[in-house]
């Protein structure tokens, strides 16, 4: 029953993303109406490339997620370099790919100049709100796990009142921070089960941010009538999904999910962009991505996704990796992780030229 509920939740999340996009983009055409495509031959040619994109992106997504999950040992130094690379990829996805897309949508001339559009930085506001919400979800989830664990052990949370007691707890916090444990609950000793559970929460929120963007780019590609637009997007989005999958796969591997859960998360990520392409193909005749409501919906979704990914990359991936004891005690590991982070961010940023 629990698995069934989780499946329903996943389907509900997809519907929340897809349905508003389709309804808003099918409204009456306005002065900013999108192109309707050309001849039947051009549409047939475009369809052929869309089918190629469907399978290419699907395979790249599966391969990207599977490589760190099934091909690497999480205890090795090399896995740390992979995590740094993955963090760079996710950070660049948020800053270079998704945030500019959101800004373009929410500052479009098609929305007019009346408040809150025009000069107001709506994209930054939404991204900031998403980051704060992500932090609150993590904080409350972590607090709930701590209270549940301590309740089972018949203990209560320690409360600092100053003086020696506060100093003792602070010292404990420093010890845990230096050992690379969670940054979120420094006053509370955390066992391995709690740390693993927190990693699972982080990974699931991260996948949500990635999936939202994957659906949007899939629908956009599937609805595009232009062969000249689709051709470069195939390669760009294929590598985009490969690198994103690589980043997500590293987090899934470290979170130690059960095998069935791993496969569910793997397929949930790998199928979202291809499903988006399929939906885009089906609604290509009515889909107008330049309608005001479609711009608002896609802009808000992209801004939300960027806020989630930027927060997760910096707070939950980069900071714990670079501040843990193993990295800090070895110049070789520190330099290698730094290079991997820059390479991951650089390669993902480079893809923004084409996608």
Curated annotation (Swiss-Prot):
<feature type="topological domain" description="Extracellular">
    <location>
        <begin position="99"/>
        <end position="116"/>
    </location>
</feature>
<feature type="transmembrane region" description="Helical">
    <location>
        <begin position="232"/>
        <end position="252"/>
    </location>
</feature>
<keyword id="KW-0812">Transmembrane</keyword>
<feature type="signal peptide">
    <location>
        <begin position="1"/>
        <end position="25"/>
    </location>
</feature>
<feature type="transmembrane region" description="Helical">
    <location>
        <begin position="201"/>
        <end position="221"/>
    </location>
</feature>
<keyword id="KW-0862">Zinc</keyword>
<comment type="function">
    <text>Zinc transporter involved in zinc uptake in roots. Targeted by BZIP23 transcription factor in response to zinc-deficient conditions.</text>
</comment>
<comment type="similarity">
    <text>Belongs to the ZIP transporter (TC 2.A.5) family.</text>
</comment>
<dbReference type="InterPro" id="IPR004698">
    <property type="entry name" value="Zn/Fe_permease_fun/pln"/>
</dbReference>
<feature type="topological domain" description="Cytoplasmic">
    <location>
        <begin position="253"/>
        <end position="261"/>
    </location>
</feature>
<feature type="topological domain" description="Extracellular">
    <location>
        <begin position="283"/>
        <end position="302"/>
    </location>
</feature>
<keyword id="KW-1133">Transmembrane helix</keyword>
<keyword id="KW-0472">Membrane</keyword>
<feature type="topological domain" description="Extracellular">
    <location>
        <begin position="222"/>
        <end position="231"/>
    </location>
</feature>
<feature type="topological domain" description="Cytoplasmic">
    <location>
        <begin position="324"/>
        <end position="334"/>
    </location>
</feature>
<keyword id="KW-0732">Signal</keyword>
<feature type="transmembrane region" description="Helical">
    <location>
        <begin position="117"/>
        <end position="137"/>
    </location>
</feature>
<feature type="topological domain" description="Cytoplasmic">
    <location>
        <begin position="138"/>
        <end position="200"/>
    </location>
</feature>
<feature type="transmembrane region" description="Helical">
    <location>
        <begin position="51"/>
        <end position="71"/>
    </location>
</feature>
<dbReference type="InterPro" id="IPR003689">
    <property type="entry name" value="ZIP"/>
</dbReference>
<feature type="transmembrane region" description="Helical">
    <location>
        <begin position="303"/>
        <end position="323"/>
    </location>
</feature>
<dbReference type="GO" id="GO:0005886">
    <property type="term" value="C:plasma membrane"/>
</dbReference>
<keyword id="KW-0406">Ion transport</keyword>
<dbReference type="Pfam" id="PF02535">
    <property type="entry name" value="Zip"/>
</dbReference>
<protein>
    <recommendedName>
        <fullName>Probable zinc transporter 12</fullName>
    </recommendedName>
</protein>
<feature type="transmembrane region" description="Helical">
    <location>
        <begin position="335"/>
        <end position="355"/>
    </location>
</feature>
<feature type="transmembrane region" description="Helical">
    <location>
        <begin position="262"/>
        <end position="282"/>
    </location>
</feature>
<dbReference type="GO" id="GO:0005385">
    <property type="term" value="F:zinc ion transmembrane transporter activity"/>
</dbReference>
<feature type="transmembrane region" description="Helical">
    <location>
        <begin position="78"/>
        <end position="98"/>
    </location>
</feature>
<keyword id="KW-0864">Zinc transport</keyword>
<keyword id="KW-1003">Cell membrane</keyword>
<feature type="region of interest" description="Disordered">
    <location>
        <begin position="156"/>
        <end position="183"/>
    </location>
</feature>
<feature type="topological domain" description="Cytoplasmic">
    <location>
        <begin position="72"/>
        <end position="77"/>
    </location>
</feature>
<dbReference type="GO" id="GO:0071577">
    <property type="term" value="P:zinc ion transmembrane transport"/>
</dbReference>
<feature type="topological domain" description="Extracellular">
    <location>
        <begin position="26"/>
        <end position="50"/>
    </location>
</feature>
<keyword id="KW-0813">Transport</keyword>
């Amino acid at each position: 029953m629990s698995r069934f509920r989780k499946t329903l939740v996943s389907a509900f999340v997809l519907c929340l993303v897809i349905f508003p996009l389709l309804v808003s983009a099918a409204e009456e055409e306005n002065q900013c109406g999108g192109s309707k495509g050309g001849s039947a031959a051009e549409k047939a040619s475009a369809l052929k490339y869309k089918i190629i994109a469907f399978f290419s992106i699907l395979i790249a997504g599966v391969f990207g997620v599977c490589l760190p999950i099934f091909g690497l040992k999480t205890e090795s130094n090399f896995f740390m370099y992979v995590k740094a690379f993955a963090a760079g990829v996710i950070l660049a996805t948020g800053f270079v790919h998704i945030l500019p897309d959101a800004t373009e949508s929410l500052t479009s001339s098609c929305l007019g100049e009346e408040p809150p559009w025009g000069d107001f930085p709506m994209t930054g506001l939404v991204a900031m709100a998403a980051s704060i919400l992500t932090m609150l979800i993590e904080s409350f989830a972590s607090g709930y796990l701590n209270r549940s664990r301590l309740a089972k052990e018949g203990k209560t949370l320690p409360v600092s009142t100053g003086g020696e007691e506060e100093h003792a707890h602070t010292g404990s916090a420093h010890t845990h921070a230096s050992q690379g444990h969670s940054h979120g609950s420094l006053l509370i000793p955390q066992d391995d089960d709690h740390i693993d559970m927190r990693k699972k929460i982080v990974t699931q929120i991260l996948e949500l941010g990635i999936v939202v963007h994957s659906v949007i780019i899939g629908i956009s590609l599937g609805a595009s009538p232009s062969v000249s637009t689709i051709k470069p997007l195939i390669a760009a989005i294929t590598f985009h999904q490969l690198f994103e999958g690589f980043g997500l796969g590293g987090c899934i591997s470290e979170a130690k999910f059960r095998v069935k859960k791993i496969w569910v998360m793997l397929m949930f990520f790998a199928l979202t962009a291809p499903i988006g392409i399929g939906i885009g193909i089906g609604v290509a005749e009515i889909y107008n991505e330049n309608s005001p409501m479609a711009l608002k919906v896609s802009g808000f979704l992209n801004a939300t996704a960027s806020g989630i990914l930027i927060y997760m990359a910096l707070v939950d991936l980069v900071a714990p990796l670079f501040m843990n004891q193993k990295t800090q005690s070895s110049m070789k590991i520190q330099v290698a992780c730094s290079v991997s982070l820059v390479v991951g961010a650089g390669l993902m940023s480079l893809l923004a030229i084409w996608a």
